[in-house]
Regions:
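Non-catalytic, polymerase-adjacent accessory regions of viral genome-replication enzymes
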Residues: 1-63
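Extended C-terminal regions of large enzymes
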Residues: 410-413, 417-506
């Protein structure tokens, strides 16, 4: 299907219209890919109103499942959505709509076809819920606007209950404008939007948070806002068409156009950075910010039917006050002078106060759980949970310029809790068996050990510069995928945290420790196929099985994908042929597979 997705993206870039998308969605290859994608999603274990999860889909015959999805798409009527209230930091709750697992599979089928079309139309500084975009990219873009461009006034706009107030008719018209002209597909999406919410009724507006396709639909709604703001300055046409040179990273140099707009127009210089429904507009002058604030508020109401929250929306002078964005708070401070004698301003980024308090409370909560257990297995799992949490917040917040200072504010309180609750069991000396922890925290004097297991110090963190996405990185072009693989030299931290948080309950501590060490050593890839593994695909295989006298030592374990693991142990010819077809191994990979089969005293595969 990758070739099909690439063609959809290329056609969308050229402005073509798409009138027969349902047939692509119904293709067996697309349905099978959708099944694989939701199977490795942890949310697939959450049941809808029918109480069914991914384990129920796993029981279906492959051809029967494909045929069932195709029939449902012919006359699609969605099941009711289960409503769950998720607590927010402010004490309120956020409604979450969970479709049935079959409806989620159908949404995934649609998402895979719509995403390349929409990606070609989305603005480059829209970062939420998009492939190869992240919160780090959004922070990097915001800091560039503040520090490099010199926009020291920021418009903070909070849309009131955005996901609950999306106009269905307007959304479908926006999809039509993007080139999605398949009326049958639009009617299916309309049915999804109007699906009954169990216990409440049929919604007249809003996109249900929790649906697989909802993030894409929300981006389609706000994409019009992005391009309206961009049209006010960055994409304003000039009388002369300037030839833009291309930088090494693929970004065009628009300095000539910008210089012309600054010198010969009275336009308001502004730049937008958005992550989902959280967006900021950066300006150089307060007078421009005031006018843009009112214009944006009115535009949202007139064009999208959305209101802003007056108490949360404001204009911030970054020289005096902080502006909060994605868990950070940003400000500018003076640092020396420019060659012309003017003060030089640099960004100062801290962790948001509420986020820092939440980190303190969560860390102390896990320490309390460690204190309450004396079972070695449970103790190990809780230490892994604590380490995983601390490493996760370090990884996310390390792009704050003052991250070390911020973590030191809570370090005393967290360490005090650690010593008071575990003081008789803590040791200063020990051996770090986790390779990643050893590389990142091994030089710290604050590392402590509990029954031989290292506990990560909460204040041992260094700032790293946030990186923006390279313009060439693209999931839907061959060149873009090459760039993606270049950036994957390291390991997937999300998978590492998952493995640390979810040790195999029936296995030994040695096994679980070596499982993490091997994942890091193999750079998150399957030892046979070389494919980078998602969390649910990671299997740790005993080269010499325990029943044959094997053990849990590092040398006797290896990380493989779940499908490869099945092939190592399977003696069923039908199963073997099925999964060999899925993997499409070459001779070298097949030799590695056979080597592991022989060690497990299984017959070599000859095909």
């Amino acid at each position: 299907m990758q070739l099909v997705f690439d063609e959809l993206y290329a056609a969308s870039v050229k402005g073509q219209r798409f009138c027969n998308l349902v047939e692509l969605i119904k293709r067996p290859e697309n349905i099978k890919l959708a099944y694989r994608n939701i199977r490795k999603n942890s949310g697939s274990r959450t049941a809808g109103v029918d109480n069914k999860t991914i384990s129920d889909l796993n029981k279906w015959n492959e051809n029967a499942l494909v045929a069932h999805v195709q029939r449902k798409l012919d006359w699609y009527v969605p099941n009711a959505v289960r409503r769950v209230e998720i607590p927010k930091d402010n004490g309120k709750t956020r409604p979450l709509g969970i479709p049935t697992i079959m409806d989620r599979l159908i949404q995934q089928c649609i998402l895979q076809v719509l995403e390349p079309i929409c990606e070609a139309k989305f603005f480059k500084r829209s970062n939420g819920f998009r492939p190869n975009h992240s919160a780090e990219n959004a922070i990097a873009q915001a800091e560039r606007m503040i520090q490099n461009v010199g926009c020291h006034y920021v418009i903070d706009i909070d849309i009131k209950s955005f996901f609950d107030n999306v106009n269905h008719g307007k959304l479908l018209k926006q999809m039509w404008t993007l080139g999605i002209r398949d009326k049958k597909l639009l009617s299916i999406i309309s049915a999804m939007l109007k699906a009954e919410v169990a216990g409440i009724g049929f919604p007249e507006k809003g996109t249900p948070q929790g649906g697989i396709i909802s993030p894409l639909l929300s981006n389609i709604v706000l994409n019009e806002l992005d391009w309206w703001i961009v049209s006010q300055w960055e994409e304003m046409p000039t009388q002369r068409n300037y030839v833009h040179r291309i930088y090494a990273n693929g970004t065009p140099d628009k300095s000539s156009t910008i210089r012309t707009l600054r010198n010969y127009t009275n336009l308001k210089e502004c730049y937008v950075v958005r992550y989902a429904d959280d967006f900021k507009i950066f300006c150089k002058k307060r007078s421009d910010a005031v006018k843009l604030f009112e214009a944006t508020k009115q535009w949202l109401l007139d064009r999208l039917g959305l209101e802003i929250s007056p108490e949360k929306s404001k204009i911030v002078n970054l020289k005096r006050h902080y502006s909060e964005f994605l868990g950070f708070k940003l400000k500018v401070r003076t640092k020396g002078k420019k060659p012309d004698g003017q003060p030089r301003y640099v960004v100062e980024a801290h962790i948001k106060d509420k986020a820092l308090q939440k980190i303190r409370e969560k860390s102390k909560e896990i320490i309390g759980q460690i204190r309450q257990t004396y079972d070695p297995g449970m103790e190990y799992r809780l230490i892994q949970k604590y380490n995983s949490y601390v490493m996760g917040v370090h990884n996310y917040y390390s792009i704050a310029t003052h991250v070390n200072i911020d973590f030191h504010k809570i370090a005393f309180d967290v360490k005090k809790s650690l010593y008071n609750r575990l003081k008789h069991r803590l040791q200063k000396k020990g051996q770090i068996t986790n390779r990643y922890i050893k590389e990142k925290y091994g030089t710290s004097r604050e590392v402590r050990y509990l029954n031989g297991h290292a506990i990560v110090p909460i204040a041992y963190v260094q700032h790293r510069v946030p990186m923006d996405k390279k313009s060439r990185v693209n999931k839907y072009t061959p060149e873009g995928r090459v760039e993606i693989h270049k950036n994957l030299a390291g390991i997937n931290m999300a998978v590492l945290y998952h493995l640390m948080n979810n040790p195999c309950g029936k296995q030994s501590v040695e096994y679980n420790d070596n499982r993490i060490a091997l994942y890091v050593a193999q750079k998150g890839k399957c030892a046979v196929s070389g494919v980078e593994l998602e969390a649910k695909q990671v299997d740790c295989h005993h080269k010499k099985p325990l029943v044959l006298g094997g053990n849990d030592s590092y040398q006797n374990l290896i990380i493989v994908s779940d499908v490869v693991h099945i092939l190592i142990h399977s003696s069923n010819e039908r199963t073997i042929r099925k999964y060999l077809k899925v993997l499409n191994l070459d001779k070298k990979q097949l030799a590695k597979l056979n080597k592991l089969r022989v060690m497990a005293e299984m017959q070599e595969l000859v095909f």
